[in-house]
């Protein structure tokens, strides 16, 4: 397994760490630690992609698992933010529904021997979601919440982009 794929696996492994820290202890220090864990996990997303492209280490595993790891990480943090009242539930429902709809689309593509790589709109969506989430974890809602609404728009747009670009897969089913 190459380094970018190891970073993707690390991101997945940090999700339960974030979950345990954030959900089972409520103090400013613990929230800060949870934010650090989330931030490290988010940073692995950028680092694994950079390394994969720079050193030509792009794999089908990475193309499939990297976006899945992002979805799991972001969903865990957003659900937590709803529970602590920092993020509206409807926003999370729309984002998570789109994330899993695209995961289903990727599974259909995979069953047909096709891997759908992340598109530019999907990358913008991920960046805005992660930055907004970090700000909300730090309770900087005045900036974090508007960024999450931008993330919502990017999420809907990129979902449409994936569906449009994969319409040949959908029409075959």
Give the location of each predicted region.
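Alpha-helical transmembrane bundles and membrane-interface segments of multipass inner-membrane proteins
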Residues: 1-173
């Amino acid at each position: 397994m190459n380094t970018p794929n190891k970073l993707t696996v690390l991101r997945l492994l940090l999700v339960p760490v974030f979950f345990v820290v954030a959900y089972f202890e409520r103090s400013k220090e613990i929230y800060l630690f949870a934010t650090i864990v989330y931030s490290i996990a988010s940073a692995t997303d950028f680092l694994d992609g950079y390394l994969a492209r720079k050193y030509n280490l792009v794999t089908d595993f990475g193309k499939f698992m990297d976006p899945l790891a992002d979805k799991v990480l972001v969903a865990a943090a957003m659900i937590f933010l709803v529970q602590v009242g920092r993020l509206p539930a409807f926003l999370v429902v729309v984002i998570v529904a789109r994330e899993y709809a695209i995961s289903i689309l990727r599974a259909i593509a995979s069953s047909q021997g096709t891997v759908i790589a992340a598109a530019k709109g999907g990358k913008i969506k991920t960046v805005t979601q992660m930055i907004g989430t970090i700000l909300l974890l730090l309770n900087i809602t005045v900036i974090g919440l508007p960024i999450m609404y931008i993330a919502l728009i990017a999420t809907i747009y990129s979902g449409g982009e994936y569906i449009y670009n994969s319409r040949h897969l959908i029409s075959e089913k």
